[in-house]
A protein has these predicted regions:
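N-terminal amphipathic/hydrophobic targeting modules at extreme N-termini
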Residues: 2-4, 9-12
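N-terminal metal-binding scaffold of metallo-dependent hydrolase/deaminase domains
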Residues: 20-77, 89-90
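C-terminal cap of metal-dependent C-N hydrolases
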Residues: 43-45, 400-455
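Active-site gating loops and adjacent loop-to-helix segments of metal-dependent hydrolytic enzymes
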Residues: 106-136, 179-197, 255-284, 309, ...
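Alpha-helical scaffold segments that flank or form the walls of functional sites
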Residues: 108-176, 199-213
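Metal-coordinating catalytic core of metallo-dependent amide/deamination hydrolases
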Residues: 164-292
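His/Asp/Glu-enriched, well-ordered alpha-helical/loop segment
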Residues: 279-283, 328-415
Length: 460
């Protein structure tokens, strides 16, 4: 603003905004080592990953228009196309977090209990603070910034029970792709955090109409877990699913042995914990179930038949002592699986750190997870789990240009390890095991940099 309070048509702020609007739609090229996945490495082996040691990613109007070897694509660019050179860093699709709680930022790394005690001791008091809309707004901004800083470009998110907690997060999201839902509870929780079957229907219908399909936002019906919902509330969720079949669903299932036993007491007619949701017709393609540690093959077969997906939450499962996920059993039944931080039960926003924990969990199950499989789960695999793989997940032409720049040499330890790696698989495995937010140089949403690490090396 000028001293008179008017925006100067020649001032630096005006010129920057004008440039930003212009460059948002003009063609841009990014040069680096580039990789993405076009299929699941478990099924398609080495052919599932594309790798360009000197690659070029070309973006226009927020979409991918080309990707390939720089030597092939550079001569095809228009003369004035800006080329952003990130060499020797790596460009890959943005990371996808399939399960996270934004109201739990303040209770991450809270000591000493397992799931059910943890909810009562830490989670419910923290979520109670979201009755204050301004507080929800401040946490939402922090949450979005933290996702960007860790290279996460898409997330499926639990809000609190307060409808305005969804509003706060959706307003803070900008152009980020999010799936968000208001938590539903009408029993076995503090009275101040409980709603009713009637309010469940009314509040969710309002939020669906307000946010679902706006910009890059989608809505998810979000019963916290079966023990905190009555029959009437689950019937309301079922009615909403039938009325709005393109809306997602997210919840928890079979995370903890004590929880599983509690569900058997509360729903004595059910065959299993998962069967409770199946009874209310809540197993469908856009449904995602977090944890799934204590399922049997009948449960897994139903998940596979329904098209529902699983969020693998390794950090949270270790921290809360919940158990070990069986990835091979899920794959055997053709269930889509994505990686999830599950903050605040999980102890890091970093999907790279969660991949490191996933590898260790699977080692304890005598199962392997090479880097290609882990990075697939964090990108295209996560997109498939969320039924977003036609929009995001890799660099297929026409997809939305969400990507990150990774510096493998960001710390002395990883630089030392990379110097002794003999091939791409060794380098990616070291990155998966040792990487974290320090290795994220930049995060791009729709081709626009929304986070850049200080001192990030870039030549244009």
């Amino acid at each position: 603003k000028t001293r008179r309070g008017y925006l100067s048509a020649t001032g630096p702020r005006f010129l920057f905004e004008k440039y930003k609007r212009k460059t948002q739609y003009m063609k841009q090229a990014y040069r680096a080592e580039i990789l993405d996945f076009i299929n699941d490495p478990v099924l398609y082996g080495l052919d599932a990953m594309r790798h360009f040691s000197d690659g070029l990613l070309v973006i226009e109007a927020g979409k991918v228009v080309a990707v390939g070897d720089a030597a092939t694509l550079l001569p095809l660019l228009e003369v004035n196309t800006p080329i952003h050179d990130y060499r020797p860093q790596i460009i890959m699709p943005g990371l996808i977090d399939t399960h996270i709680h934004y109201p739990q930022c303040e209770v991450i790394a809270s000591y000493g209990t397992q799931l059910l005690d943890w909810l009562n001791t830490y989670t419910f008091p923290a979520e109670g603070k979201f009755s204050d809309f301004k507080y929800a707004q401040s946490v939402a901004k922090f949450f979005i910034d933290e996702l960007h800083r860790n290279g996460t470009t898409t997330a499926m998110v639990f809000a609190s029970v307060h409808p305005h907690s969804v509003d706060a997060l959706c307003e803070a999201a900008g152009d980020m792709r999010l799936i968000v839902g208001k938590v539903l509870m009408d029993r076995n929780a503090p009275h101040s955090l409980c709603d009713s079957a009637a309010s469940t229907y009314d509040d969710n219908k309002t939020l669906i109409k307000r946010w679902h399909g706006q910009k890059r936002l989608s809505y998810a019906l979000t019963p916290r877990f079966a023990p905190t919902s009555t029959d009437a509330q689950l019937q309301a969720v079922q009615a909403l699913h039938h009325e709005f079949p393109d809306v997602h669903l997210q919840t928890h299932v079979a995370e903890n042995k004590e929880e599983v036993a509690w569900v058997a007491e509360l729903f004595p007619w059910s065959r299993s914990y998962l069967d409770v949701y199946d009874h209310y017709d809540l197993l469908f393609e856009r449904a995602l179930f977090a944890h799934c540690l204590y399922l049997n093959d009948t449960d897994r077969a139903r998940l596979g038949e329904s098209g529902a997906a699983i969020a693998f939450c390794p950090s949270s499962n270790l921290f809360l002592g919940s158990g070990l996920f069986d990835l091979q059993a899920a794959q055997k039944h053709n269930i889509q699986v994505g990686i999830a931080s599950d903050v605040g039960g999980g102890t890091s926003f970093s999907i790279l750190q969660n991949l490191s924990d996933a590898y260790k969990v699977l080692q304890l199950k005598q199962q392997a997870m090479p880097a290609r499989q882990g990075l697939y789960l964090a990108t295209l695999g996560g997109a498939r789990a969320l039924k977003l793989d036609t929009q995001i997940g890799n660099f297929e032409v026409g997809k939305e240009a969400d990507f990150i720049v990774i510096d493998p040499d960001a710390t002395p330890l990883t630089a030392q390890r990379m110097a002794h790696a003999t091939n791409i698989d060794e380098r990616l495995f070291a990155l998966m095991m040792l990487g974290d937010d320090r290795h994220i140089s930049a995060t791009y949403i729709l081709g626009e940099a929304i986070y850049t690490k200080p001192f990030c090396t870039l030549q244009t």
